[in-house]
């Protein structure tokens, strides 16, 4: 008897990663993307070594590496004094320790690599204009409802449909995500317009009272990505809203003039109010399962949102490949393998923002002293749990 396809709701990085991993295990996959074409909004993302472990497992390691910019260090600056607090070398010692590099990449460049790999795979069917609104299931199959009125039936539904997941709405039913109160402003500018005095080959983070600022090069050093965040108790959840430079500047008039340059050189500023959810244990409903932001949306302070979705994709593919005739056991193994790690990212990201990046006064002085007294090996030890993780090994 022909095996029913696995349905993936969402054509983002996590959804396409899951499609590739499952197809590489011999499963037919249908990807349902709500947008009229497959693409990614947003700009830069940071990729730890754990992301490259996932790319290699999924068969896109070479393409991902070709799109990446390999920064020399993670650089932490005091936004009030413009002094370096600490840096983490990302050299050969780092790569030897964690088995892979640290890099930054334009989200759209990376997404194109995954789309191409899916398009080239005989077992993957990519469908656009296919917004998932819900599902029904019996003991042997699951039927997905689309906004168009059409339905698609398969063996399993993977809800990789993001922060506002329709699959999660039915599976968990916990309402809208919660606002963090943090507003993030984004801009991408040509590299020649970026100030030479801070045009570093680094992923740089400026830490200040109730704010932080990040910048790094992208797309073969053609542009710089600027992401600045203010804890301004924002309550109205917006995504990609345009605003003026004056509106951005008003949130950062208390910091040193050197990082303030980022606001002045930025163009076409857009704002997002960051949202997440508290960790939830119920990722599974019969033949429906959650992945990525649909399962464990997180704030950006660990720079691990995309990495966690890719790890999910690897883990889910591995457990289903290892349990081809026992879907229930595979899904339980997937959830139990991923739950605590992703919860650590969710909870830890909030704590990093509130209790480390955004502090002032004596708290900031203590932070700077602790960070400044740590060696490269100290940082590597501290990050072992994060960057040394191989999702495929733990799923075996």
Language model regions located:
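Short, flexible helix/strand-to-coil boundary loops that buttress conserved ligand/catalytic motifs
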Residues: 42, 58-59, 68, 88-89, ...
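Conserved N-terminal helical subregion
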Residues: 2-6, 23, 48-190, 233-251, ...
């Amino acid at each position: 008897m022909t095996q029913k396809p696995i349905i993936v709701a969402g054509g983002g990085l996590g959804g396409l990663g899951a499609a590739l991993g499952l197809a590489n295990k011999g499963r037919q996959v249908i990807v349902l993307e709500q947008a009229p074409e497959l693409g990614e909004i947003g700009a830069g993302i940071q990729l730890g070594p754990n992301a490259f472990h996932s790319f290699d497992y999924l068969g896109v390691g070479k393409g991902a590496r070709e799109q990446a910019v390999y920064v020399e260090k993670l650089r932490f600056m005091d936004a009030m004094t413009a002094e370096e607090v600490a840096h983490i070398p990302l050299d050969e010692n780092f790569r030897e320790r964690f088995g892979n590099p640290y890099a930054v990449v334009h989200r759209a460049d990376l997404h194109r690599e995954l789309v191409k790999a899916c398009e080239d795979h005989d077992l993957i069917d990519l469908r656009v204009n296919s917004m998932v609104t819900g599902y029904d299931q019996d003991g042997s199959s699951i039927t997905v409802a689309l906004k168009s009125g059409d339905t698609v039936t398969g063996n399993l539904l993977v809800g990789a449909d993001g922060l506002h997941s329709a699959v999660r709405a039915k599976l968990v039913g916990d309402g809208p995500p919660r606002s963090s109160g943090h507003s993030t402003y984004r801009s991408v500018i040509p590299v020649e317009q970026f100030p030479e005095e801070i045009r570093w080959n680094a992923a740089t983070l400026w830490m200040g009272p109730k704010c932080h600022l990040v910048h790094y090069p992208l797309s073969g050093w053609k542009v710089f990505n600027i992401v600045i965040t203010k804890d301004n108790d924002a309550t109205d959840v917006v995504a990609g809203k345009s605003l003026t430079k004056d509106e951005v500047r008003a949130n950062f008039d208390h910091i040193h003039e050197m990082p303030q340059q980022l606001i002045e050189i930025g163009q076409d500023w857009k704002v997002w109010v960051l949202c997440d959810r508290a960790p939830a244990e119920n990722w599974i409903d019969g033949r429906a399962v959650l992945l990525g932001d649909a399962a464990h949306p997180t704030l950006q302070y660990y720079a691990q949102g995309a990495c966690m979705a890719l790890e999910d994709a690897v883990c889910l593919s591995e457990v289903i490949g290892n349990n081809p005739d026992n879907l229930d056991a595979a899904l339980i193994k997937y959830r139990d393998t991923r739950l605590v790690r992703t919860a650590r990212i969710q909870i830890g990201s909030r704590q990093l923002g509130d209790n480390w990046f955004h502090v002032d006064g004596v708290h900031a002085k203590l932070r700077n002293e602790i960070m400044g007294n740590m060696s490269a090996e100290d940082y590597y030890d501290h990050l072992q749990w994060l960057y040394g993780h191989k999702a495929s090994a733990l799923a075996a």
